[in-house]
Design a protein with these regions (language model features):
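A conserved beta-strand-loop-helix scaffold within acyl/acetyltransferase catalytic domains
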Residues: 6-56, 60-74, 121-126, 131-149, ...
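Glycine-rich, N-terminal phosphate-binding loop and its surrounding beta-alpha-beta segment
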Residues: 59, 63, 75-123, 127
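Aromatic (often tryptophan-rich) hydrophobic motifs at membrane interfaces
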Residues: 79, 96-107, 218-335
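Short amphipathic alpha-helical interaction patches enriched in hydrophobic/aromatic residues
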Residues: 88, 205-209, 296
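Conserved beta-strand-loop-alpha-helix junction that forms the acyl-donor binding cleft
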Residues: 119-129, 294-303
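Active-site/acyl-donor-binding loops of N-acyltransferases
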Residues: 1-9, 14, 67, 135-161, ...
């Protein structure tokens, strides 16, 4: 265990839900996966933990961990998804704060609780190389031999006309086609809209014959528990034949995240998905959101979606790769427990695909 540097301190499980959301919105890198609602729905209230790091009494970093333990032995994992959060909204981010918060996380979950700690920080391959050094110096190694997933991030600080001009020619043409049709946009955060979207989403999944990457019903439950200012944005597009497309986006910090998209069978020719994305960008611009994360690309396994997102991002879109997951552990029992649990989960997943 390494003490935090002078002036820094940490607190664990000392905040309630309302205070957590107040702190969450102070960080530019705040996101859906660090919301209380997400952790509670995914793991249950007893299986989430909240850590604060302070400098001279002022909160400068936070992290929500999801805790999974093996029965009887008490060993297991603490997982920080898209965290910790350490980039303030109104000030310049300091890499030293990142160092202190991952040290505090390791002290609590590895040294005190004997768990395997795995973090998935919002760091990309084009960020400063200092972060890899900090992770290594603080006792973290890359989780397995995995390479981080890719995504495209749009800079929304540019004028709207520049963003439109940056769209690739194919995307611009499809958007113009959609704008000439009599399409109606319905938007909000209500459960009724979520229900309509799910019906369309399930229809698309059945048509394309692919396995859902995320449990959308779980996200509906999360939506019901999120406070108003953190709820997901739902946008639906209606043509003369009914609902033709929809999307769900999350905006908690300075980056909007595209979570789900769907197109109905009857809406295949409406180009509604193009219109929705553009209307969403207009809405994000009005809210002064700085970035739009198109949330995952894979040219090999999903070339169609990759092309859609690449053309939307245009020439100015950042095609980036996450640094990946990093972990630290001092307990052989926790390492073994997590390894067995993940193997069983992988086997179960393979059986479901057959």
């Amino acid at each position: 265990m390494r003490k935090l540097d002078g002036g820094y301190s940490s607190e664990v499980d000392a905040v309630e839900e309302k205070e957590w959301y107040r702190l969450l919105h102070q960080f530019d890198d705040a996101n859906m996966y660090q919301t209380w609602a997400y952790g509670q729905v995914r793991n249950g209230r007893r299986n989430i933990s909240h850590l604060l790091v302070k400098e001279q009494g002022r909160v400068i970093a936070i992290a929500q961990s999801r805790i999974v333990k093996a029965p009887l032995v008490g060993a297991g994992i603490a997982y920080v998804m898209w965290g910790p959060l350490w980039r303030p909204r109104e000030a310049r981010a300091d890499a030293e704060v990142f160092r202190q918060v991952i040290r505090a996380l390791r002290n609590e979950y590895v040294c005190r609780r004997g768990l395997l700690l795995r973090i998935y920080p919002i760091l990309f391959d084009d960020d400063s190389p200092c972060f890899l050094s900090i992770l290594a110096e603080e006792g973290f190694t890359r989780a397995g031999d995995e390479h981080g997933s890719r995504t495209i991030i749009m800079d929304l600080n540019r004028p709207l006309d520049e963003l439109r001009q940056a769209l690739r020619p194919h995307w611009q043409r499809e958007l113009k086609v959609a704008e000439k049709q009599k399409l109606e946009i319905v938007e909000g955060s209500e459960d009724e809209l979520f229900e309509i979207f799910i019906d369309m989403y399930r229809e698309m999944v059945a048509r394309k014959k692919f396995r859902e990457p995320n449990d959308i019903d779980e996200f509906r439950t999360i939506q019901q528990r999120l406070p108003v200012e953190s709820k997901m944005k739902i946008m639906l597009c209606r043509s003369s034949e009914g609902m033709c497309s929809g999307l769900i986006c999350s905006v908690v910090g300075g980056t909007a995240i595209y979570l789900f998209g769907a197109t109905s069978t009857t809406g295949m020719k409406s180009r509604g998905s193009y219109l929705l994305q553009w209307k969403l960008i207009e809405w994000l611009k009005c809210g002064r959101v700085a970035r739009y994360d198109l949330n995952g690309i894979n040219p090999e396994t999903n070339p169609g979606t990759y092309k859609f997102k690449r053309d939307l991002g245009g020439d100015k879109g950042r095609d980036v790769r996450f640094l990946g997951r990093f972990e630290s552990c001092e307990s052989i029992v926790s390492v073994a427990s997590v390894s067995v649990g993940e193997r069983l989960k992988s086997i179960a997943g393979s059986m479901m695909k057959k």
